[in-house]
Amino acid sequence: MAENSLLRFITKNKVAILATVSAGTAAVGAYVYYQQIKQQQQQQLKGTKDNRRQSEAFAGQNEDEADLKDDGSVVSGSNKRKKKKNKRKRNNKAKSGEGFDYPSLPNGEPDIAQLKGLSPSQRQAYAVQLKNRGNHFFTAKNFNEAIKYYQYAIELDPNEPVFYSNISACYISTGDLEKVIEFTTKALEIKPDHSKALLRRASANESLGNFTDAMFDLSVLSLNGDFDGASIEPMLERNLNKQAMKVLNENLSKDEGRGSQVLPSNTSLASFFGIFDSHLEVSSVNTSSNYDTAYALLSDALQRLYSATDEGYLVANDLLTKSTDMYHSLLSANTVDDPLRENAALALCYTGIFHFLKNNLLDAQVLLQESINLHPTPNSYIFLALTLADKENSQEFFKFFQKAVDLNPEYPPTYYHRGQMYFILQDYKNAKEDFQKAQSLNPENVYPYIQLACLLYKQGKFTESEAFFNETKLKFPTLPEVPTFFAEILTDRGDFDTAIKQYDIAKRLEEVQEKIHVGIGPLIGKATILARQSSQDPTQLDEEKFNAAIKLLTKACELDPRSEQAKIGLAQLKLQMEKIDEAIELFEDSAILARTMDEKLQATTFAEAAKIQKRLRADPIISAKMELTLARYRAKGML
């Protein structure tokens, strides 16, 4: 629960504005923006679609065809109708050459040699004439002729960006997107803030899958203020989402079918295995087995696991894999030895749940089913149920919890984990019954007490929840779990000062434990509050609290380097410090460590948004505009 508080703060507390991607001070930038844009689209679906049509249609128009005024506003409907009424007349003029006056060859083509001999001002004037004829060919959808006349105009005046931009509009119509990019780039080399060229190049890059390039141009457009944000923002959001998914899929394909192969944080492991009786689990190895080497390997693995230390978890992971391989080999030669089957089932069961914790669901289910086939235990059914619950197959996973109950109705972890599932599904009545059952079967385990207290809070009974926490503190005065989870509830209520005191108590209690209990949870929880408090005044950062949050999260990353929440929180603060490279590395690490696809996508989105920010910052002109944008938002109290 403690690690999740930072994520909740990040995703709920920042203003969703375009500057979070392009200017970057607001911590999570793109993901918050992405989530809130989706809500806006649901609320204003028609308006958003209309705006998108306006901006994307504009990308394919030439300089004289765009139904937008010079200030970026849309031309009135009556003016549009006038243009349509005159379209046939203009088409006829384009074919005949009527209305254009420039030196021509006998075949009617412009005499470029003669035109080049004129003065610069005359060349520019004739270049406009040639461009105008190109525009009429464009209107008639004779794009090859339009391109030819725009090229003539360029020969006379190569420093006019409109000519290159109009050629790009022709190539949009013919579908040659590489040429669109080529000619919009030429226009932008002359005039870097040319809005039509920026939009066209962004659209072409999106179609070609160059989403980062598209985001760059769209961010510049937004900073320039050339378009209504409602037109540009959905395009930026769309490209950011596509880029994040592209990168995430590429990363997943490198490790296809094997999950992350990285253990979750020590804090998560301690919480997961905390409900199990360590002495009972270690002693579950059948000592009558004749296979001493395999027995010793399995026994050592479980002892290491329940030592609940950083080294213990890593070694247990390795030993369980080796133990499973050894038992597979032994079973190939002997399938009737009962002690062998029991120990093999135990090794497969724990290796399976480790695969699950590493987000390798398929292998986890195969190993757990194999364990059940050899020798079913409550744990094998519990673990299999959890793998199915992770796939949101609710009906099936409850079936396996029931099998665990049928096998041993007095086993506390079954009720605890099933209660957790009921809790998640907001079935508080059944959750309470299961937590109470787990509590009665093992009154010396703190976790059912904590969940019952949290359950009261979720039901809107804070006073009762607080009283239950206080009673639990009296029973477990030295355990850091109680103040840690109580601090989570206080944080959720906005009682930050009291929450910080509880986190400090939890931190001191954790430091004197031989085993990991709540790990870095108190550090992350306190850092979350301090980070939030440091930015309460939009006009001035509280540097003392901000630096304290940085220090806590840095320490958390050192103590538990596999914690994606510590890294993503530290990355957010590094981004505020303009330490973009460090932020990107931390976001990318978080994406690797994250367990769910949503979490991986979130961290990847952060990283890709930060990369765009870095690219924008590298341009001194754009960087200056970003600072102006930030100053404007700060003045309005939006950051």
Swiss-Prot record:
Source organism of the structure: Saccharomyces cerevisiae (strain ATCC 204508 / S288c)
One example GO MF annotation: mitochondrion targeting sequence binding
Name of this protein: Protein TOM71
Source superkingdom: Eukaryota
Any one Gene Ontology BP term: protein targeting to mitochondrion
Entry membrane topology: Single-pass membrane protein
Protein function: Involved in MBF1-mediated mitochondrial morphogenesis.
Phylogenetic placement of the source organism: Eukaryota, Fungi, Dikarya, Ascomycota, Saccharomycotina
Mitochondrial intermembrane side: 1-14
SMART domains: TPR
One Pfam assignment: TPR_1
Compartments where found: Mitochondrion outer membrane
SUPFAM superfamilies according to UniProt: TPR-like (SSF48452)
Keyword Phosphoprotein in record: yes
Residue spans crossing the bilayer: 15-32
